[in-house]
Amino acid sequence: MIAMPVLGSSAAEIDKILGQSTPPFGVVFEIVENDRAFLNRAVLEVTKYIQQLRQKFPQLHIALVSHGKEQFALMTKQQQKQSTLHKKVRSLIQDEHVTLHVCGTHASWYGIAPEEFPDFVDVAAAGPAQINDYVKLGYTLIRIRK
């Protein structure tokens, strides 16, 4: 088990990074809530943080890992109902070069296969393990909470 840093608010963590003269290797945003509707708000918050980070550190590596019920808003069958969210997420991936992962294990608990997500969504075997991998690489973990 990897010891995860204890973090304050996500805004305080962003301010801490912005106060540094050199960037971390990368930033990984973690979203995990038991609320299917939360991803819309979380993506808006993450987008704001990415803009702030990229203004100071244009080449910063950024990843986003969703591994709660909110990840189901990214399923292919939700593309029409959640079209604004899907467009925002695609823009983060294409325009901001953000790597996005959802949790295959969590999805499997609800009988959802990786193929039920669109191609722009990477279905990781396990969201927490994906986050641990980023932290091992030197990414700073920022948790997005309600």
Where are these regions (language model features)?
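Acidic helix-start/capping segments at beta-turn-to-alpha-helix junctions
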Residues: 60-74
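Glycine/serine-rich loop-strand microenvironments at binding/catalytic pocket rims
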Residues: 1-41, 124-132, 139-146
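Envelope-exposed proteins and targeting segments
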Residues: 25-27, 58-60, 96, 119
